[in-house]
Regions:
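Transmembrane alpha-helical segments of polytopic membrane transport and secretion proteins
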Residues: 1-2, 78-88, 280-291
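Membrane-interfacial amphipathic/re-entrant helices at transmembrane-helix boundaries
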Residues: 1-21, 49, 61-63, 89-95, ...
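Helix-loop-helix "hairpin" substructures at the membrane interface of multi-pass membrane proteins
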Residues: 14-15, 136-214, 237-243
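Short, non-helical or kinked segments that cap or interrupt transmembrane helices
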Residues: 16, 25-47, 89-94, 164-167, ...
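Transmembrane alpha-helical segments in multi-pass inner-membrane proteins
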Residues: 18, 58-69, 193-200, 204-205, ...
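Cytosolic-side transmembrane-helix boundaries in multi-pass membrane proteins
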Residues: 21, 113, 173-180, 184-187, ...
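Membrane-embedded helix boundary and interhelical linker motif in transport proteins
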Residues: 30-77, 81
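Transmembrane helix-bundle core of multi-pass membrane transporters
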Residues: 85-86, 91-161, 188, 253, ...
Length: 291
């Protein structure tokens, strides 16, 4: 029993990472019908930059705030320089190549300047685990699913109750109509990518005390989070979080009852099967085209 509880707890923690990073893909897709494939590396930048600043003597909260702000700037620059120029036509896909290339460059630069090895981010919440019967989990890990759910509800409130949020929803619904109403879609896209990057960086900072911050920590997380968003139905924030949390639990169960090596293979196989059964995503809606 304790073993199952352990897998559930650590799975929810892992799922919280996927959910937070996948929420970033949701935000970007809603604004531009494109995505930033450097998103996993932005997650890494949040963790790595925070560690570097703390090592320089800054308080953790200040270092984390600077890292999140820097990630937001990176996200905005990526939208302006690597997505917008290559996403002018309805079926344009050039942004895929440019953002993938940028992600490789970011990881390479981080490896050169930071080093390839992981370094810890100190946190009092990662020193003593909380015990639940035969299972244990650090309070730091428990933050991840809590923050993911809070971010989801926060985004929903932001989209519904703020002028900027309603403008972002209008662009997501109909970009042309939003333009005619005086909304600047390019400005909305810039803000969306900055917001997505900030959330991704936050996820990296929250997990850094547990897994250590390293340049290679982001690429696979970003790929899995994108898969989570697609399987959920990328235009559904609640679905993205639910699938993210569930996928984390599934991975830990695979790791525990099959093997660590099988985790990625079986996990991606399940993603493929889910898309075969739900082509629009589990929580997605089939688009109706009127002619």
């Amino acid at each position: 029993m304790g073993e199952i509880v352990q897998y559930l707890l650590t799975g929810l923690s892992l799922g919280g990472i996927y959910a937070l990073v996948a929420l970033g893909f949701y935000i970007m897709w809603e604004a531009t019908k494109a995505a930033n494939f450097t998103h996993g590396d932005v997650y890494m930048v949040g963790a790595v930059l925070t560690v570097v600043l703390v090592e320089k003597g800054l308080p953790v909260l200040l270092a984390a705030s600077i890292a999140i702000a820097a990630a937001a700037v990176i996200g905005a620059l990526i939208e302006r320089l690597l997505v917008r120029p290559f996403n002018k036509e309805p079926n344009a896909i050039g942004w895929m190549l440019t953002t993938i290339a940028a992600g490789i460059m970011i990881e390479s630069m981080a490896t050169i300047t930071y080093g390839p090895l992981g370094r810890p981010l100190p946190s009092p919440l990662a020193e003593q685990p909380i015990r639940f019967g035969g299972a244990g989990i650090y309070p730091q890990e428990m933050l991840l699913p809590i923050v993911a759910v809070a971010a989801m509800f926060g985004l929903e409130a932001f989209y519904r109750r703020t002028t900027l949020g309603r403008a972002m929803r209008a662009v997501a619904f109909n970009r042309t109509a939003a333009s005619l109403m005086g909304i600047n879609p390019n400005r909305i896209a810039l803000i969306a990518y900055a917001l997505a990057a900030a959330i991704g960086a936050l996820a990296g900072i929250l997990i850094a005390p547990v897994v250590q911050a390293a340049p290679a920590m982001g690429a696979l997380i970003g790929l899995k989070a994108f898969g989570v968003a697609i399987v959920a139905g990328i235009a559904n924030a609640r679905g993205v979080v639910i699938v993210g949390l569930c996928y984390g639990v599934i991975e830990k169960l695979i790791e525990g009852y099959i093997s660590t090596g099988a985790r990625n293979a079986v996990g991606f196989t399940l993603m493929i099967l889910a898309l075969l059964l739900f082509p629009q995503g589990i929580f997605g809606r089939r688009e109706v085209v009127k002619v």
